[in-house]
Amino acid sequence: MGQKINPLGFRLGITKNHNSHWFAKPNNYSEFLQEDRKVRNCIDNYVHRHVKNSSNYGGVARVEIQRKTDLILVEIHTGFPALLVESHGQGIEQIRKDVQQNLLDSKIRRVHVTSTEIAKPYGEPNILAEYIAIQLENRVAFRRTIRKAIELAKETDIKGIKIQIAGRLNGTEIARVEWAREGRVPLQTLRAQIDYCYYPAQTIYGVLGIKIWIFRDEE
C-alpha cells in the first residue's frame, strides 16, 4: 500500500515540512490558499515563457511562501539560478512584478522574491523529472533516458531512486508502465526521508506520466 498514498503528505509533520508557512483565520484560509496557488502559477508561467525551451529547463525544485501582516516572502529554490536571473537581466524583479500585478488586486501588500541555489540539482525529483520530460519530448528512447537520469541522481548523496514512466512509450499503440530502481526506496518507513514528484511530458503520441521517488536517508 506504500504506493497508494502521496509520500510527501504521508510524512508531513514527521520528515517533511510545509512549503507555505503562515497562519490564518478560518474566514481567510481559503483566500490565502488560492493566493499561494496563484504565486506558484506566476512563477511557472514565467519559467515557461522566458527560461524553458526544447534544450533548456527551468530547474525550479520548490517554492516556499511566508506571510507577514503586509508582506509576502517568496523563496524560489532552483538548481540553475543563472537561468532564472540572467535570462532577461531582471528575472527576479519581473517575477515580483507579475505576482504583484496578478495576485494582490487592490490590497496594499508588498512582495519580496528571492532565489536560493541548490548545490546538487539532480538530487531533486522535480528537476530530474523535468530533465526526463524534455528528453522524451525530443524523442529520446525512454530506457536510455531512465538510465541517464539514474546516473545523474547517483552523483548526488542519495541512497535510492525509483523512476516510473506510464503511457504510449516509444509511440506504441497500447499504453504501459515501465520503471527502474536503484538502491533502496522504503516507502512504508515513516522515518525515511522520501522526496516524490509527478510530472507530465507532452509528446506527439500523447501524455506520458513521470513519477520519481528519491530516498535520501533515515532519521
Curated annotation (Swiss-Prot):
Subcellular location: Plastid, Chloroplast
KH type-2 domain ranges (all copies): 47-119
InterPro entries from the UniProt entry: KH_dom-like_a/b (IPR015946), KH_dom_type_2 (IPR004044), KH_sf_prok-type (IPR009019), Ribosomal_S3_C_sf (IPR036419), Ribosomal_uS3_bac-typ (IPR005704), Ribosomal_uS3_C (IPR001351), Ribosomal_uS3_CS (IPR018280)
Keywords: Chloroplast, Plastid, Ribonucleoprotein, Ribosomal protein, RNA-binding, rRNA-binding
Gene Ontology terms for molecular function: rRNA binding; structural constituent of ribosome
Entry keyword Transferase: no
Gene Ontology CC: chloroplast; cytosolic small ribosomal subunit
Any one biological process term the GO annotation gives: translation
Pfam families in UniProt: KH_2, Ribosomal_S3_C
Main location: plastid
Gene3D superfamilies: 3.30.300.20, Ribosomal protein S3, C-terminal domain
Keyword Cell membrane attributed: no
Similarity annotation: Belongs to the universal ribosomal protein uS3 family.
Subunit structure and binding partners: Part of the 30S ribosomal subunit.
Protein's name in the database: Small ribosomal subunit protein uS3c
Organism the protein comes from: Huperzia lucidula
